[in-house]
Every structure is written in C-alpha cells, then in structure tokens.
Amino acid sequence: MGIDLSVIWFVIIVFATLMYIVMDGFDLGIGILFATTRDAQDRDVMVNSVAPVWDGNETWLVLGGAGLFGAFPLAYAVIIDALAIPLTLMLIGLIFRGVAFEFRFQATPSHRPFWDSAFLGGSVLATFSQGVVVGAVINGFSVSGRAYSGGVFDWLTPFTLFCGLGLTIAYALLGATWLVMKSENPLQDKMRHTSRALLLALLATIAIISLWTPLAQPAIAARWFNLPDLFFLLPVPLLVAVIGAWLWRDLRNPARHALPFILTLGLVFLGFSGLGISIWPHIIPPGITLWQAAAPPQSQGFMLVGALLIIPVILGYTFWSYYVFRGKVQHGEGYH
C-alpha cells in the first residue's frame, strides 16, 4: 500500500488550522475583550501579554491557505468563490487589528481611543467572519462539475451567523483565560469573572449548534447517531461536559492560573474535532472528497518536501518565543 499524500496533506492543513485557532484565537479574543474595560492600564497589559508573540500566529493561517491551494486546488477554488465576501471581511478585520495593534502604542492620548476601537472592531470582524466560514462549510456548497454553482449570498444563513457568534464567544474565552494566566490582580480577578460568564455562553452555544447541525444535515445526523458510530463518538460530548465542569471549578480557585487556559484549549480542540468528524471524508461538503479535490501526486509530493522543512522551523520559533516571554505581565511593562 502506497503513501496517501491526500490524507497527509489533509492532516497538515488541519494541524495548521488548529494551530491558528489556538495561537491567534486568544490574540483576537483579547481584542474582543477590549469591550469589557475602558481602563487604559488594563488595556496596555492585555496587549502587552501578546505583543512579543502575536506576529507569528498568522503564519499558520498562511500555511493552511497555501496548503489548500497547492494540495486541493478544486477545494480552494470552490471555497474562494463561495465565501469571497466573508473571507474578504476576515482579511479586512485582520488588517485593522494588526494596524491598530502597532499604532496604538505610538498614538497620542487623544488618538489612542480611535486605535483601541479599531483593535476591538477588527478583532470582532475577523473572528465573526471566521465563524461564518465554519458554519458555511458545515452547511455545504452547491457544486456543478468542478465549479461552484451557488449564489453570492448562499453563505448568509441564521446557522452561519450563529456559528459566527459562537466562535466570537470561544475566542473571547481563550483571551480571558490567557489573561488569567498572564496578568495579576485586579485584572486577573476581573478576567476570572468574565471567563465564567463566557464559559456558560460557550457551553450553551455548543449545545445549540450540536443539536442544530444534525437536524439540518441528515448526513451528519447519520454519522453521529447511527450504530455503532454512536458508541465511538459519544466520548466527545461527554468530554465537553467534563472539561466544562472542571474549568468552571478552577475559575473559582484563585490559585489556578494556567490550567483554565489549558482546559479552554481542550474545549476548542473538541469543538474542532467535532467539525472534522462531521464532514469527513469530504473537503467540500456534501459531495467532494479529499481525493476528488486533490492535486496530482507529483505536485503534492513536491510541496510536501517544503512543508516538512518549514513546519519544524515554525514550531521551533513558536515554542521558543513563548518560552522566552513566559511569566506574568505587569502594569508598566511593554515590548514597544
């Protein structure tokens, strides 16, 4: 049996996407949490907690997009055509977030509120757009032959908008628990209270999406509820409940600093796993599989050589930067 390059590339793209969600998720979450405080010192601590590492987080988004373009060109073409508007809005949000992140440090006191608002708005827009994209992927795409045949606004449904809200809550929880780990009181205590409210909202959102999805998509319902698959997949929602209860308990314990963030990562991973289980083996639901969308094996093999060289470098840089800038961030500290 030969090596299945399509599966390997799917794993690489999934890994890059998950790394992006984890790394840039709490970064965007901090921008979203600007809505919870107007205190200038608290906002400085929030931004300084990610200032040394945020530049490299979007590398994973570039890797995932480039991998999709090269390894699954049909999937890339359909997704770009079907989701042109939300993807464009996401990029606009990321640009605003990035520019505001840098400019707020250089701005005069009278101009800083503008850049703070741009940071908040860009973070919300980018996050909400990503959630809409996730919802649209779950809904599936109309494809005729090898081209997208749906409408310009097929992505715009109540379900996709709710997914946008859900991802916004998830990123905000990532950001809040990151600040529990990286900040000190009184900001840390405030983020504990905020995290508890966000956790309840996220668990409710997960429950609604978990019920809404199989009701709207019979194929996904069959995947999750038919025997014997039900027995193998049942641990996923059970783990969500267990981790949610564990996280709630630790957020009430002032001695716990890092564990709430780790548990939140677990919730994000389980949600991401649920998405993968629901659509596998389709890369363009409901009808195009990995192998139907794949590039020629020669192209995938050539790209794989480069990926195997660059991914360890990205991982090494990422872990080193987080190691160097570990520890708490205090008022008055900064990296600009």
Regions found by a protein language model. Give the residues of each.
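N-terminal signal-anchor module of multipass membrane proteins
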Residues: M1-G56, V62-G65
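Alpha-helical transmembrane segments and their helix-start/interface "positive-inside/aromatic belt" motifs
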Residues: V7-V11, H111-A126, H193-L198, A255-L265
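Juxtamembrane membrane-water interface segments of multi-pass membrane proteins
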Residues: L28-P52, G70-I79, E102-P113, G175-T194, ...
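Membrane-interface helix-loop-helix modules in multi-pass inner-membrane proteins
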Residues: V53-L125, I138, S144, R223-F231
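Long hydrophobic alpha-helical segments that form multi-pass transmembrane helix bundles
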Residues: S123-D189
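Membrane-helix interface motif
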Residues: V132-A147, L211-I220, G276-G287
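Hydrophobic alpha-helical transmembrane segments
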Residues: P158-A170, L234-P237, G301-I314
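Short, membrane-exposed interhelical loops at transmembrane-helix boundaries
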Residues: I284-M303
